Each structure stands twice: as structure tokens, then as C-alpha cells.
Amino acid sequence: MTQLYNPRKACTLYIENQILISNILVLVYRNLIAATDKVFLIWRVAFPAVYIFVVGYAYSALIGDRGIVVGSLSITYTSFIAAGMIGFNVMNASGIAGSIIWNDRRNGMFQQLLVMPFSRIQYVISSLVATILVGLASAALVILIGLPAMFQDISLTMGSLSYTFCAVVLGSIFFGSFTIILSTKIKTSEAHNVINTSLFLFFAFVSSAFYPTQGLPESLSIASYFNPLTYVVNITREGIFSQVDEFTNIEIFILILFSSSAFIIATRSIAKMHV
């Protein structure tokens, strides 16, 4: 039996959806204002610039004329690390999601927000949307900064750029969710700082961000493929240099699994967090 169209129910559903979106946007704006300041913005520029133009060219002198293979293309080390810094910077920027929740817990702001017409799921989604926006802005910034270093090798198309876009978004979701999980479990500031720093160092250096995994010892090379940053960086590079192939789609699928799993765990962690 077909159901009759109920205009009142449809109108109510529309209003509820509008309120949901409005609440999330309000929290996103609040998160962006709270998490970004002059020091944060300067660091987002200075850190990748130092790695690209100091570390990149210094290591290039050691490597010599040997290129690094990405797909069917041989690129310079400066191009390699410039593209790698996009994923690395996304990981660093994603820390704002955990920082927001950590500070809200300590300052009692989380309780105040829940008294207002905001739900826990809206809180999580808004934190991740803010993280994605910062991640995309960071990626665009690194591309602009690294353009002189990558100019001779870069080969962007709309199709390949979409892979880089997906890598940045999925990477932001994973690392944003990961920092949310840590912030809900850790009790002290000292432990929060030590654990965050240690884990992010592991993510950074047991990955393909700074060097190709093919030349690493076997155990380290295998470990890097359990690291989501490896997939973020690989997909980003393959998009930047138009070296997308069937394996890139497999990497996207694996990254989706990492990101969706982390998001589910982060949502449950917030739902169980005591006010």
C-alpha cells in the first residue's frame, strides 16, 4: 500500500535538517576561530618551506643525479619531498581536532556546548569538517610553496587532481579522528603531549613521506604499509605527477577503510565520554 505524501512531515524533516546543518556550521566556524591563530598560520608556511628548500636541496646534493621513481616517471628528490610534505602537513594540521576536544574538556566548554542545542555527533562532525578545511588549505599552500621545486616534474589534470583531493580529505578524517580518540582517552597534559608527539613521529618516519619505501629494510617497508600516512602521501604524489593506475584505486580503498574505522571509533569515544 503506497503512503500518501504528508506535507507536514516533509516540512518538519526539512526544518530539522536545516537546524542540523546550521548547528554544524556554527560549530565549524567556532572551531576554526579557536584553533587557528597567527603562530599556527606562520608554522603552516614555515615548516614545509624549510623541509622543501633546505632538506630537499641538501639531500639532493647527496643523492646526485639519480631520480626517484613514481609510477613510470623519474623525479628529483626535491619534487618527491615537496609532494610528500602535502600529506605530512595534512597530518600535522589534523591535530587541531584533538586539540579542540582536549581544551574543551579541560575548560568545561564541552559540557556547556551540550547544554546548548548541539549533539555529540554534531560536535564530532564539526571538528572533522574544520580539520578537512584546514587540511585542504594546508595542501593548497604547500603546492604553492613547493611549485618552484616541483615545476619540472609536476603534471596535473582534473582527473589526477581529484585523487590528491581525496587523499587530503580521507587523510584529514583519519588523523582528525585519531587525535579525537587520543584526546578522549588520555587524562593528563603531559601524557597527551608525549603520546601525540611519539605517535606522529612514528607516522612521519615509518612512511613514504621523506623517502621511498622500496629502499627501506624489509621489516620497515612492511610496517610502512600499515601506516595510513603512506597511502595519503602515495596517492597525493600519484595525483600531483599524473601517475594514477589501478594500484592507486586500491590505495584509495585501503585509506577509506582506515578513515571510516577511525571515524566510527572516534564517534563512539565521544558518545561514551563523561561530561
Regions of interest found by a model, annotated:
Residues 93-118, 275:
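Transmembrane helix boundary and interhelical loop/hinge segments in multi-pass membrane proteins
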Residues 57-63, 183-226:
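Transmembrane helix segments
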Residues 34, 155, 207-261:
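Membrane-interfacial helix-loop-helix junctions in multi-pass membrane proteins
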Residues 2-49, 108:
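Aromatic- and glycine-rich beta-strand/loop motifs that create alpha-glucan
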Residues 2-8, 62, 240-243, 253-275:
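Junction motif at the cytosolic side of a transmembrane helix
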